[in-house]
């Protein structure tokens, strides 16, 4: 019996290493790997890209575009973990739970672009509410998120874990101060927003895990929309989702904090709705592993869908 062959182009980066770890002991796929001395040789990479059934690209954006250009075999399918193709119309966006039937679309796609880590939480919260008409498309969305330092890639991990004093000097590092983070167009397009969201990301002095929050003013929503209706919409949308759950309102009322590391090592996404009815305010939240549902876990979930595993979504 032959098994599908998977080639991870860029398997020594943060995401590539995680995907390799998730696949190496599986018996239903065969990993195609290159010797260390050949990993950066264009000709050898091109050979591997054309010899596999599914290529997973864990590369910087320019290198990912180059890798796609190397592929001449029309049978090769691609999952791109970079941000190079996330807003391209000829690529399927790899967030299975974001819409009815989307997992089926991924399962039959030739080209799948893995979502960014922050967009996973933002789109997961916003898209169902926008689709239901509970949140206007022109709502002035503000997104605040804190990720573990692994969100900065291999260089950030090496800096923090080597004891680099400068890297570890601040417990929290807010960045993207030009308000032009590369995830903004992705969030706007796939959430369905009419305008650019305001996005402020930060890195914390811990390895992995994200807490993302979006404040909502109920007075800016259509008449009759309450925090409870926002929660009910999300709960209904994700009722059958294997990897997304919505915190019950009672649990949200009892919560005193959100732990960004709570879902580390999983491919799960936990959404929350915190309501101050008297103040007319709601806080939407998403907690997940930036290396799990925000990267490698999502890639493997998409791979499983492309291989025909119905349980993956």
Swiss-Prot record:
It comes from the Bacteria. Its EC number is 1.2.1.38. The keyword Cell wall biogenesis/degradation does not apply. Keywords: Amino-acid biosynthesis, Arginine biosynthesis, Cytoplasm, NADP, Oxidoreductase. One of its GO terms (cellular component) is cytoplasm. The active site is at residue 117. Pathway: Amino-acid biosynthesis; L-arginine biosynthesis; N(2)-acetyl-L-ornithine from L-glutamate: step 3/4. CDD domains: AGPR_2_C, AGPR_2_N. Transmembrane segments: none annotated. Catalyzes the NADPH-dependent reduction of N-acetyl-5-glutamyl phosphate to yield N-acetyl-L-glutamate 5-semialdehyde. Belongs to the NAGSA dehydrogenase family. Type 2 subfamily. This is N-acetyl-gamma-glutamyl-phosphate reductase. It comes from Burkholderia cenocepacia (strain HI2424).
């Amino acid at each position: 019996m032959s098994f599908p062959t998977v080639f991870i182009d860029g398997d020594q980066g943060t995401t590539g290493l995680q995907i390799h770890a998730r696949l190496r002991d599986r018996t239903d796929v065969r990993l195609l790997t290159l010797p260390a001395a050949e990993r950066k040789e264009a000709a050898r990479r091109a050979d591997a890209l054309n010899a596999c059934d599914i290529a997973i690209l864990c590369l910087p954006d320019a290198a990912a575009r180059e890798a796609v250009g190397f592929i001449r075999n029309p049978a090769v399918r691609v999952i791109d973990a970079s941000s190079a193709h996330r807003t391209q119309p000829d690529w399927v966006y790899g967030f299975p739970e974001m819409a009815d039937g989307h997992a089926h679309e991924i399962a039959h796609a030739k080209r799948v672009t893995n979502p960014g880590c922050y967009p996973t939480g933002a789109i997961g919260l916003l898209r169902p509410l926008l689709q239901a008409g509970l949140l206007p498309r022109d709502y002035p969305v503000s997104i605040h998120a804190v990720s573990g330092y692994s969100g900065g890639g291999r260089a950030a991990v090496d800096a923090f874990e080597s004891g680099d004093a400068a890297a570890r000097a601040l417990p929290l590092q807010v960045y993207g101060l030009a308000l032009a983070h590369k995830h903004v167009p992705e969030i706007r397009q796939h959430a369905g927003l009419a305008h650019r969201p305001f996005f402020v990301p930060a890195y914390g002095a811990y390895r992995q895990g994200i807490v993302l929050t979006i404040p909502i003013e109920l007075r800016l929503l259509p008449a009759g929309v309450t925090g409870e209706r926002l929660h009910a919409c999300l709960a209904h949308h994700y009722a059958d989702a294997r990897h997304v759950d919505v915190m019950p309102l009672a649990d949200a009322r009892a919560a005193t904090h959100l732990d960004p590391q709570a879902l580390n090592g999983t491919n799960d996404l936990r959404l929350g709705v915190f309501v101050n009815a008297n103040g007319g305010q709601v806080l939407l939240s998403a907690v997940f592993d930036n290396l799990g549902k925000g990267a490698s876990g999502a890639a493997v979930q998409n791979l499983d869908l492309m291989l025909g595993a119905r349980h993956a979504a």
